[in-house]
Amino acid sequence: MRWRVALIDSCGSRPEAVDAAAFVTEPGRIECRQAGADPTGHGSRIADVLTRDRSVELLLGQVFTTAGPTSGAAVAAAIDWAIARRADLIHLSLGLAGNRAVLAAAVGRAIDADCIIVAAAPARGALVYPAAYAGVIRATGDARCAPEELSCLAPGLFGACPRLESVGQTSAAGGASAGAAWVTHAVIAGPARVASRDVVAALTARAKFVGPERKTSATPTR
């Protein structure tokens, strides 16, 4: 059974996409529109990682329709859209700087629907949302990790390669966004329709490194 993965980002078109929609913030409302071209390329590079050696059905929730920021309400609308389309996993290589009730409620609905959520989080520093919400798998970049390697930095916080790959090329850019993409890539290597707690256990067992990244050399756990 193939995973159905909702990518909430800037990407609006992919061969693997079974549905796509754009969520645009207007005064006092969120408009659902036809998805368009990726204005930044970020979401497309994330999609390259998610679909690398994986057969997945993508749902594209385009919340970055320009090079500017998105809103918590737009992300929440995209999450609800993904739930309605029976996403197994929602991937968010993004983080908002403040808690928003509308976003917290949407995340709660996704968790109640047994949808796994993977969201980018900084390895250090202030919390970001939706990664800070209970039940969300937090993911970040870890320079110790090569592509497809994982670290367990803390309970429920996983690190992975901090670089994005696109069309056979590797970019030095990425950080937490790239790490989150590689964590989702690891999740969808396993069977679909599994509980989030089982996914966390599987990621923890797979981790090559345990504990926070240090500036000194690290020894793998296995």
Language-model features: where?
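Subtilisin-like peptidase catalytic core
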Residues: 32-96, 206-210
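Active-site core segment of subtilase-fold serine proteases
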Residues: 1-56, 167, 211-216
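Short glycine-rich anion-binding loops that position phosphate/pyrophosphate groups of nucleotides
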Residues: 11-13, 94-97, 123
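C-terminal subdomain of the subtilisin-like protease fold in secreted/lumenal serine endopeptidases
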Residues: 1, 7, 88, 192-222
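Structural detector of well-ordered beta-strand residues that form the stable sheet scaffold
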Residues: 59, 116-118
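Extracellular S/T/G-rich loop segment that most often corresponds to the catalytic His/Ser-adjacent loop
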Residues: 9-14, 128-192
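Mature extracellular/periplasmic domains of secretome proteins
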Residues: 1-2, 70-91, 100-115, 125-140, ...
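Gly/Ser-rich catalytic serine loop of serine hydrolases
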Residues: 32-44, 122, 170-183
